[in-house]
Amino acid sequence: MHLVIGAGEFLGNHVSAALAVQAPVIELNADADDETLGDAIKSVEVVHTCAETWSPAHRLRFRRDPPRLLNRVVQAARRAGVRRIVHVSTADVYGPDHIAKITERSKLRPTHAYERLKLFEESWLLESTQDLEVVVLRPARIFGPGENWMLPHLMRSMARGRVWLPGGGRVMQTFIAAEDVGRACLAAADRGKPGKAYLVGGFDATWRELLESSARAAGVGAEIISLPYDLAYLRALTAEAAAAAGAPVWPGVFAVDTIGKPHQVDDSHSRRELTWSPSVGSFEQLMPQMAAWLSELPGVEGRREPEAISPPNRSLS
């Protein structure tokens, strides 16, 4: 039996659905009270923590407070005799300044508050659970229906006719479908080594390619314009300076670095050790599942027929 913490959220929903294909699953919201958490965790062997503890869409400040949700989960897991915790973190803990592909041996150089907070969560969890098996997953850039940070903002701009991207969105990234993160969770639950962190990826592509595919699926025609990275960063820095701590900001400097700097991972180690592989190898493969969601995003007015815009081999601009 598997318990997923983060039900009702983007990643939690996809992880639950992927796990349910292979094993019985209990879903729990991140804000469930202690009594509900205690009741749910009694009968499970593995707990998957994939709730959004920090939102990259907000102006964050780094602090060393023990992660409240993880602390509650750990205490409940101890009382219930849970065998293993699979914690979904992020490849962003390595920081934004790696030119070569990241491996598990790459240096951890987090810069942004979000990156540092996520790494602190990992460290706290591993140091505080010597009596429990903990496996950490570090997914590359996650995409899929329900994603609530990048695509809603970018698609709203697309619907208005143009979107400005650092470097034109042509910098190579590693993406992974949210459902494949769920499959990696199952592999980590069965075969991950306690105390280890694994990178998990899907395929290499660009933000520009994701937006072009999304625009076709949603029936939106738009121009993608290249903005110099330095100018995009300066604009984001100005926006953040005007925002209160914890307030939403778009685009923030983290978003600019997410689009404008390379973030590629080499997950060959996890594929060998966990004996898993992703099922989604391109944006186009997932677009039939994403089309309705994309076309219903706030500010997006378009048709759902991909043929209405342009064939897949034609650039939007």
What do the PLM-derived regions correspond to, one by one?
Residues 1-21:
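N-terminal Rossmann NAD(P)H-binding glycine-rich loop of SDR-like oxidoreductase domains
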Residues 72-114:
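Conserved Rossmann-fold NAD(P)-dependent oxidoreductase catalytic core, especially the SDR/UDP-sugar
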Residues 111-135:
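Active-site Tyr-X1-5-Lys
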Residues 32-72, 76-78, 93-96:
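NAD(P)H-binding glycine-rich loop region in Rossmannoid oxidoreductase-like domains
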Residues 267-273, 277-317:
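Amphipathic terminal alpha-helices
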Residues 119, 143-153, 187-198, 220-222:
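Glycine/proline-rich active-site loop of Rossmann-fold NAD(P)-dependent oxidoreductases
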